[in-house]
Amino acid sequence: MNNYFSMEAFDYDDIQLVPNKAIVNSRKECVTSVKFGNRTFKIPVVPANMESVIDEKLAVWLAQNGYYYVMHRFQPEKRADFIKMMHEKGLFASISVGIKDDEYDFIDELVEKDLIPEYTTIDVAHGHSVYVIDMIKYIKEKMPDTFLTAGNVATPEAVRELENAGADATKVGVGPGKACITKLKTGFGTGGWQLAALRMCSKVARKPLIADGGIRHNGDIAKSVRFGASMVMIGSMLAGHEESPGNVIKIDGKTYKQYWGSASEVQKGAYRNVEGKQMLVPYRGSIANTLEEMKEDLQSSISYAGGRDLESIKRVDYVIVKNTIMNGDY
């Protein structure tokens, strides 16, 4: 067994960060921006590239307002037009690809049409794969200027291999998401120890990590940054908004929106190899308000960390307070 796995397993609810002496008069002085690729974004948060979280309209709004996004890959025939549309608007294009044979043809098509996205994400449930490594090498050969994220992975070995293949960033998290049941269906994943997995991966990472899944509270963003994340991918907390895809459903006077995992029956259209589920999330109003609240809470986190920017969070001490009730799913 790798020595990394002798470390104690913990997750977000098991960790509390330890405050340092504050040096700012107000949290408003704290800067939450993060450089990712060649661009700087307002906060280290990106909505999950799931069909129930992001669509073209929301992608445009996010890009226009200084937020990072990754468009999902579940309407593959629309991706080239999406890149063209974003570029015509003077915005950056960020897309997802898979690893099947026709994706190689798609990459060739983009090169032929000179539709090179600024960001590309290889989106695979089990990213520590020879096929993912082959796709990384192909994309970096054909589109060397695209900032390439690959995932998802759970181990330091996987991070090393994807980085060595040419990935510019790696996405960490296998099945910890609220709409994901990978750990229940397969016995594998980072559900219940996602934060520890992030910590282990950060020990070897030379390039940025995206923490993907398991975020239940705004404070979890700061915890992700503390344990090595440059960016935090969030699904359920950024679903259910006015701008979010999904049908609006009213039950007993309360308003909800549909939310489903990328490997769910809803997504696949059939009950086969299902590792996701469908659920209802409360209607939350405008996503702008939620993102602003995340920014303000992160500013408070920076203040507690005794700094002025995100770097200060990476240096704070922490304590492990085992919470057996709230560990994992709740």
UniProtKB/Swiss-Prot annotation:
NADP(+) binds at residues 209-232. GO terms for molecular function: GMP reductase activity. GO terms for cellular component: cytosol; GMP reductase complex. It is an enzyme of class 1 (oxidoreductase). The active site is at 180 (thioimidate intermediate). The keyword Cell cycle does not apply. It catalyses: IMP + NH4(+) + NADP(+) = GMP + NADPH + 2 H(+). One of its GO terms (biological process) is purine nucleotide metabolic process. Its EC number is 1.7.1.7. Gene3D superfamilies: Aldolase class I. Keywords: NADP, Oxidoreductase. Pfam families: IMPDH. Belongs to the IMPDH/GMPR family. GuaC type 2 subfamily. PANTHER family: GMP REDUCTASE. Catalyzes the irreversible NADPH-dependent deamination of GMP to IMP. It functions in the conversion of nucleobase, nucleoside and nucleotide derivatives of G to A nucleotides, and in maintaining the intracellular balance of A and G nucleotides. This is GMP reductase.
